[in-house]
Regions:
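A compositional/biophysical signature of low hydrophobicity enriched in polar/charged and small residues
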Residues: 1-262
């Protein structure tokens, strides 16, 4: 991985260009051709550094319920249990962790019609957990991380719609977010189809958005307008790349738990 690869990885973790030819735009920013950008990203995906490029949506704004789950297993059962839990489509960030009686931690999201606690309890029983803790999200503070591949450091961020500015506008947005972050936003069936389509991994071809738009029965410009609308309604956090942090050179991963006054 050379400096051009690293610069590209930095760029695609920022809001990914939603333009007709995004790889051409990326190439202009780092001084290489569109095809070279595609070739480099293809290789980064082959070596498992680049996981995918897609829209990232806020599950809570879509009516999903989320929780952090901690489970305790006998050491010899841990790997098998983790593999079984990974089969659930609502599971993410599943890690074996040290420093606690609970040695497997993951996040779980379920659709509105499903019971969150019942789902976690079923998974616990099915995998033979000794004990479980379910910790539903009560308040949202910060989410997301960017890996600075050039300076080799990570930075967390809070998503913010592109339309939100600073000063009074930002203060108003902060207040609105604090009051409504966990409230579902109505979406139409057509919008649900678009959300599913935009979550698919972006093809590494010169005009990748055209095929998504065609599948949804709209023009590419209409797709871009819909993505902007999703961001303004805070349904979509961002459109960007997700990296495998260990393959990217970031070896450490820790979760910190504090008990603080309300």
């Amino acid at each position: 991985m050379d400096i051009i690869d690293r610069k590209l990885l930095n760029l695609i973790q920022a809001p990914f260009p939603m333009v007709d030819q995004p790889f051409q735009k990326l190439g202009e920013e780092v001084g290489i051709s569109e095809q070279e950008v595609i070739d480099r990203l293809t290789e980064l995906k082959r070596t498992n550094v680049l996981r995918q490029i897609s829209a990232i949506f806020d599950t809570r704004r879509l009516g999903f319920k989320t929780t952090l789950v901690a489970m305790a297993y006998e050491p010899e059962q841990l790997h098998k249990a983790a593999m079984e839990i990974n089969k659930h489509p609502g599971v993410s960030h599943n890690y074996a962790r040290e420093g606690s009686y609970y040695n497997l931690w993951f996040t779980l999201a379920v659709p509105p019609e499903h019971d969150l606690e019942a789902t976690a309890t079923y998974m616990s029983r099915k995998t033979g957990a000794l004990e479980q803790r379910i910790m539903p999200t009560k308040r949202f503070f910060k989410i997301g991380v960017n890996f600075d591949m050039v300076n080799k450091k990570g930075s967390s961020f809070n998503f913010r719609p592109d339309s939100v500015k600073s000063g009074e506008d930002k203060a108003a947005a902060d207040k609105d977010e604090a009051e409504s972050w966990n409230k579902a936003v109505p979406v139409t069936e057509a919008e649900k189809d678009a959300i599913r389509g935009m979550q698919e991994d972006l093809e590494l071809i010169p005009r990748p958005y055209d095929s998504i738009a065609q599948q949804l029965g709209m023009s590419t410009d209409e797709l871009f307008a819909l993505a902007k609308d999703f961001q303004e309604r805070r349904i979509m956090r961002r459109y960007s790349a997700v990296l495998h942090h260990r393959r990217s050179g970031f070896r450490a991963n820790a979760m910190i738990v504090w008990k603080v006054p309300e």
